[in-house]
């Protein structure tokens, strides 16, 4: 696996062509190297932040499936997923904090932070964290997105002596 720092889990340099190293350029099809998968996720978020729905759609396979396990919602297909994002209420901005890609499994994960403001000017911005899992086809297009939106909560009492808060 490779993260956005460009260091491969096995210690190889990205783009290496060693046939013994799974997930490198020589053991995957074009468009599914770790760098290509990371690039696809970066392009997805860059386009979403810019509200460039044409570029956003270009990262998606026609049959993309979007899952939200916490609300048990599923969106099937590129057109519906584009509309879902275009029509999302309020204003939001995304910060990509980390992308990890696995070319051999044609999958990636991203951790993001969102700043969300409501439709009303007096509403205070809300900071949210999210974790996203992506799957890809052989061309490097996104075939699946699963989003988790964990909510912060106070820890249980009795472990203050073991932890530090941030």
What are these regions, as identified by a protein language model?
Residues 1-58, 163-166:
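Short, low-complexity N-terminal intrinsically disordered segments enriched in polar/charged residues
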Residues 53-106:
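A solvent-exposed, acidic/Ser-Thr-rich amphipathic alpha-helical stretch
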Residues 66, 110, 144-145:
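Short hydrophobic/aromatic-rich beta-strand segments that constitute the beta-sheet cores
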Residues 81, 95-101, 114, 129-135, ...:
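Hydrophobic/aromatic beta-strand elements that line small-molecule binding cavities or substrate pockets
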Residues 90-91, 115-127:
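Short, cysteine-centered beta-strand-loop-beta hairpins and adjacent loop/turn segments enriched
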Residues 103-107, 134-142:
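Short, solvent-exposed coil/turn segments at beta-strand boundaries
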Residues 104-116:
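A short hydrophobic beta-strand element
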Residues 144-166:
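Low-complexity, intrinsically disordered terminal/linker segments enriched in charged
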């Amino acid at each position: 696996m490779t993260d956005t720092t460009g260091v491969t889990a096995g210690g190889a340099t990205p783009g290496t062509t060693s046939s013994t190293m799974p997930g490198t350029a020589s053991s995957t099809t074009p468009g599914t190297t770790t760098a290509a998968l990371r690039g696809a996720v970066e392009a997805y978020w860059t386009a979403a932040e810019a509200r460039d729905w044409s570029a956003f759609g270009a990262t998606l396979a026609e049959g993309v499936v979007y899952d939200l396990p916490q609300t048990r919602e599923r969106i099937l297909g590129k057109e519906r997923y584009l509309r879902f994002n275009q029509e999302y209420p309020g204003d939001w901005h995304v910060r990509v904090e980390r992308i990890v890609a696995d070319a051999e499994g044609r999958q990636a994960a991203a951790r993001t932070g969102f700043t969300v403001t409501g439709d009303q000017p007096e509403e205070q911005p809300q900071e949210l964290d999210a974790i996203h899992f992506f799957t890809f086809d052989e061309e490097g297009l996104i075939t699946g997105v699963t989003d988790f939106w964990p909510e912060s909560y106070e820890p249980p009492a009795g472990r203050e002596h073991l932890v530090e808060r941030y």
